[in-house]
């Protein structure tokens, strides 16, 4: 995708040709670039679906994994636009949204949210404590490898809470990240060409009868 974007920048920097033929060629190049970007997006999603796993759940065989990520019908995909929760509840939708966030370089938001969902289901106090520290070092502390964008007061509160970890350690931060995704990334995902393509109903072509 980066190479395609670089080509787009190169194209925009070239001097404009005033001839009609040049304008037609420019339009063709833009359409070709859009198709390339969409193809690359689909490739990324396909790879992601084949190599992703939900936190806290054991990996299963190839057959069950393929069944879990069956491409939705246009009607099912359209349901994702009704509410953000509808998108997150779909395994394919969640994987598609993660791939989209990865393309926007903000995948840490959904990863943090999923880690919190897994954390809240943890029953063992020992596991709760170790998971809390891992989430803190991965997403919360300053210069964490996947640092999320939350305010200093919330970070300080979390640092205090994980000393005696409870299932509500990250509730405030999770709600803020959820709101950020719902109000920013989610609308952009719904406008993406990939999502629009999923919602398109296949055109039925009828072959002419032989005479």
Swiss-Prot record:
Gene Ontology CC terms, in alphabetical order: cytoplasm; cytoplasmic side of plasma membrane; cytosol; mitochondrion; nucleolus; nucleus; plasma membrane
Record note on what altering residue 111 to A does: Near loss of EIF2B5 binding and inhibition of in vitro translation
Entries under PROSITE patterns matching the protein: RGS
Result when mutating residue 196 to R: No effect on down-regulation of angiotensin-activated signaling pathway
Effect of mutating residue 4 to V: No effect on down-regulation of angiotensin-activated signaling pathway
InterPro entries: RGS (IPR016137), RGS2_RGS (IPR034947), RGS_sf (IPR036305), RGS_subdom1/3 (IPR024066), RGS_subdomain_2 (IPR044926)
Source domain of life: Eukaryota
Result after altering residue 86 to A: Near loss of EIF2B5 binding and inhibition of in vitro translation
Reported tissue expression: Expressed in acute myelogenous leukemia (AML) and in acute lymphoblastic leukemia (ALL).
Outcome reported for the amino acid change (mutating residue 87 to A): Near loss of EIF2B5 binding and inhibition of in vitro translation
Entry protein name: Regulator of G-protein signaling 2
């Amino acid at each position: 995708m980066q190479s395609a974007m670089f080509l787009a920048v190169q194209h925009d920097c070239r001097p404009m040709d005033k001839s009609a033929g040049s304008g037609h060629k420019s339009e063709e190049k833009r359409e070709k670039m859009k198709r390339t970007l969409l193809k690359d997006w689909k490739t990324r999603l396909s790879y992601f679906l084949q190599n992703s796993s939900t936190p806290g759940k054991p990996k299963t065989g190839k057959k069950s994994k393929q069944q879990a990520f069956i491409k939705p019908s246009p009607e099912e995909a359209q349901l994702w636009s009704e509410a953000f929760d509808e998108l997150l509840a779909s395994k394919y939708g969640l994987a598609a949204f993660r791939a989209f966030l990865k393309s926007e370089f903000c995948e840490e938001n959904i990863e943090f949210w999923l880690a919190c969902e897994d954390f809240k289901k943890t029953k063992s106090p020992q596991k709760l404590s170790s998971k809390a520290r891992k989430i803190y070092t991965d997403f919360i502390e300053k210069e964490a490898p996947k640092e999320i964008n939350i305010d200093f007061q919330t970070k300080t509160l979390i640092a205090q809470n994980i000393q005696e970890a409870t299932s509500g350690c990250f509730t405030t931060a999770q709600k803020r990240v959820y709101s950020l995704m719902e109000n920013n990334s989610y609308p952009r995902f719904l406008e993406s060409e990939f999502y629009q393509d999923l919602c398109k109903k296949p055109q039925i072509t009828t072959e002419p009868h032989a005479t």
